Amino acid sequence: MPPKKKKVTGLIKLQIQAGAANPAPPVGPALGQHGVNIMEFCRAYNAATESQRGWVIPVEITVYEDRSFTFITKTPPAAKMILKAAGIEKGSGEPHKTKVAKITEAQVREIATTKLPDLNANDLDAAAKIIAGTARSMGVTVEG
């Protein structure tokens, strides 16, 4: 007889610095209200994201009835990747009036390749269009 499926009691979505999860807010309160062992999650997350230090990594935590959990890490947000590629701190306050930086078509394709598993796109061209749109809405011009 196959083992019984565990009942899911919660789904938590967080964006945490890679390798820097700690029990302080926002991690502690979000997990605490579901009864998850916070330090156990922090250790597992930090080990899983150690190689991506410096990035903000979104994570989806599934909490089960017996208070156990599983988590899936995603790729860094497209906006953060665009900022890093353009070498700027933040996007434009008025994106369609003031342009703050330029990135090349090649950089857009590189970001799209990285983000492809998380995007709702069937191929690289569609993913590149999504990334280019995100860049435009941040006041970053795409050249090429």
UniProtKB/Swiss-Prot annotation:
Domain of life, source organism? Bacteria
Q: Which GO terms describe its cellular component?
A: cytosolic large ribosomal subunit
Q: Which GO terms of type biological process are on file?
A: translation
Q: Which Gene3D superfamilies match?
A: Ribosomal protein L11, C-terminal domain (1.10.10.250), Ribosomal protein L11/L12, N-terminal domain (3.30.1550.10)
Task: Report what the Swiss-Prot or TrEMBL entry states about this protein's PTMs.
Answer: One or more lysine residues are methylated.
Q: Which UniProt keywords apply?
A: Methylation, Ribonucleoprotein, Ribosomal protein, RNA-binding, rRNA-binding
For the keyword Ribosomal protein, the answer is yes
Q: Which SMART domains match?
A: RL11
**GO MF term (any one):** large ribosomal subunit rRNA binding
Kindly indicate whether the keyword Cell cycle belongs to this entry. no
* Entries under Pfam families matching the protein: Ribosomal_L11, Ribosomal_L11_N
What is this protein for, i.e. what is its function?
Answer: Forms part of the ribosomal stalk which helps the ribosome interact with GTP-bound translation factors.
Q: Please describe the quaternary structure of this protein.
A: Part of the ribosomal stalk of the 50S ribosomal subunit. Interacts with L10 and the large rRNA to form the base of the stalk. L10 forms an elongated spine to which L12 dimers bind in a sequential fashion forming a multimeric L10(L12)X complex.
What NCBIfam families is this protein classified in? L11_bact
Q: Which family does it belong to?
A: Belongs to the universal ribosomal protein uL11 family.
Protein name according to UniProt: Large ribosomal subunit protein uL11
UniProt organism field: Streptomyces antibioticus
Q: What high-level taxonomic lineage is stated for the organism? A: Bacteria, Bacillati, Actinomycetota, Actinomycetes, Kitasatosporales
